[in-house]
């Protein structure tokens, strides 16, 4: 497993001086729809202990901690492509997987 960084994400990481992120799932449920959206969130140094048992993927200056729920939904990927999203509030996103959208209504 490896991490591929876009040029923007490399710049973002250099500015933020942060190297630890958790990859998790944001679950959204609306009428007739369930959405599983992968998220990448910064981990504060004081919170690192909480993630010690998570599966890890790293390169020389970045560690991604994969939540059990992320692994259950998406599995372990060969590569994690990271880019930056957002206009005012920048954040990392995974670009090589899409949200899973499920239709939960039983329409006959």
PLM-predicted stretches and their roles:
Residues 1-108:
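Domain-level signature for proteins that mediate thiol-based redox and metal-cofactor handling
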């Amino acid at each position: 497993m490896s991490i591929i960084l876009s040029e923007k994400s490399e710049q973002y990481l250099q500015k933020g001086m942060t190297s630890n992120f958790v990859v998790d799932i944001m679950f959204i449920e609306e009428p007739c729809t369930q959405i599983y959206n992968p998220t990448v969130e910064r981990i504060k140094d004081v919170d690192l202990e909480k993630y010690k048992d998570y599966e890890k993927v790293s390169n020389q200056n970045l560690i991604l901690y994969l939540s059990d729920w992320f692994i259950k939904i998406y599995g372990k990927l060969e590569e994690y492509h990271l880019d930056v999203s957002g206009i005012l509030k920048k954040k990392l996103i995974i670009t090589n997987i899409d949200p899973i959208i499920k239709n939960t209504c039983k329409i006959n």
